C-alpha cells in the first residue's frame, strides 16, 4: 500500500477573470520511505501541488489518500490533527517566530504537543547542530542570515519526526556547501527514521540526488 496516493486531482485559480488550470488530473503514488524531488518551471504549480499534498489547500476535484484514509473526507479539525501529527513543512519563507531563539523555535512544536521539555530541547539542539547551527542556538531570527533561518525552519520541520516531509526550495538561499549538508541530512533522517520526503527544487544537484525525480509541466506530473 502506498503511503500517499493522489487520484485525478484538479486545481484551478482565477486571475483577472481568467481561469488558470494548475493541476490537471494528477495521479501519483508515493511509497513509504521514498525520497522524491519535484522540478518544473517557475509558475508551473509546484508549490500548489505541495500544498494539496500537505492538506493546506483542497483540490477542486480528486482525492488525496494517506495509507487507506481519504484525507479531505475528514472534517477541518481532523485534517489539522492529521497534518500536525504526520507532516513536516519547510516553506520558501521560514515563518520563524521573531521573539524566540533558534532553539526555542525548533523545540516549540514538540512543546506544544506536550512532549518532555528536556528531551524536546535536547533533540532540537541536536538538529540545529546537524544543520550546522550549533553555534547559533541562542540567536533570534533577526540575527540570522536568510540561509541560516531556512536551516532553522528545516530543523523545526523534523523535530516531531514526521512520517512525511514536504519542502519547498529548502536550499534556495544556501551556498553549495551548505546545501550539500542539507542533502546529507535528508538522506540521514530517511535512513534513520524512514521519513518520506517530497522536495520542490530548482537545484539540479539536489534533484538528481533523489532516487525518484518528478516533473510538473502543463498541469501534469511525470517521471523526470
Curated annotation (Swiss-Prot):
Keywords: ATP-binding, Cell inner membrane, Cell membrane, Membrane, Nucleotide-binding, Translocase, Transport. One of its GO terms (cellular component) is plasma membrane. InterPro entries: AAA+_ATPase, ABC_transporter-like_ATP-bd, ABC_transporter-like_CS, ABC_transpr_LolD-like, MacB-like_ATP-bd, P-loop_NTPase. The keyword Transcription regulation does not apply. It is a peripheral membrane protein. The complex is composed of two ATP-binding proteins (LolD) and two transmembrane proteins (LolC and LolE). Belongs to the ABC transporter superfamily. Lipoprotein translocase (TC 3.A.1.125) family. Part of the ABC transporter complex LolCDE involved in the translocation of mature outer membrane-directed lipoproteins, from the inner membrane to the periplasmic chaperone, LolA. Responsible for the formation of the LolA-lipoprotein complex in an ATP-dependent manner. This is Lipoprotein-releasing system ATP-binding protein LolD. The gene is lolD.
Amino acid at each position: 500500500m502506498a503511503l500517499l496516493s493522489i487520484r485525478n486531482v484538479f486545481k484551478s485559480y482565477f486571475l483577472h477573470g481568467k481561469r488558470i488550470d494548475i493541476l490537471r488530473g494528477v495521479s501519483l503514488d508515493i511509497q513509504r520511505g521514498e525520497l522524491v524531488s519535484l522540478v518544473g518551471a517557475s509558475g508551473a504549480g509546484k508549490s500548489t501541488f505541495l500544498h494539496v499534498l500537505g492538506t493546506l489547500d483542497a483540490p477542486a476535484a480528486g482525492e488525496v489518500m494517506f495509507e487507506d484514509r481519504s484525507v479531505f473526507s475528514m472534517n477541518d479539525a481532523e485534517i489539522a490533527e492529521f497534518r500536525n501529527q504526520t507532516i513536516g513543512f519547510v516553506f520558501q519563507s521560514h515563518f520563524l517566530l521573531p521573539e524566540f531563539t533558534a532553539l526555542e523555535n525548533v523545540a516549540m512544536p514538540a512543546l506544544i504537543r506536550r512532549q518532555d521539555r528536556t528531551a524536546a530541547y535536547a533533540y532540537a539542539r541536536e538538529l540545529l547542530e546537524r544543520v550546522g547551527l550549533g553555534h547559533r542556538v541562542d540567536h533570534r531570527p533577526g540575527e540570522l542570515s536568510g540561509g541560516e533561518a531556512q536551516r532553522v525552519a528545516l530543523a523545526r520541520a523534523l523535530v516531531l519526526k514526521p512520517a512525511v516531509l514536504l519542502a519547498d526550495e529548502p536550499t534556495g538561499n544556501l551556498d553549495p556547501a551548505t546545501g550539500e549538508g542539507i542533502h546529507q541530512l535528508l538522506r540521514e533522517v530517511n535512513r534513520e527514521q524512514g521519513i518520506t520526503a517530497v522536495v520542490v527544487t530548482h537545484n539540479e544537484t539536489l534533484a538528481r540526488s533523489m532516487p525518484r525525480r518528478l516533473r510538473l509541466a502543463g498541469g501534469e506530473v511525470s517521471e523526470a
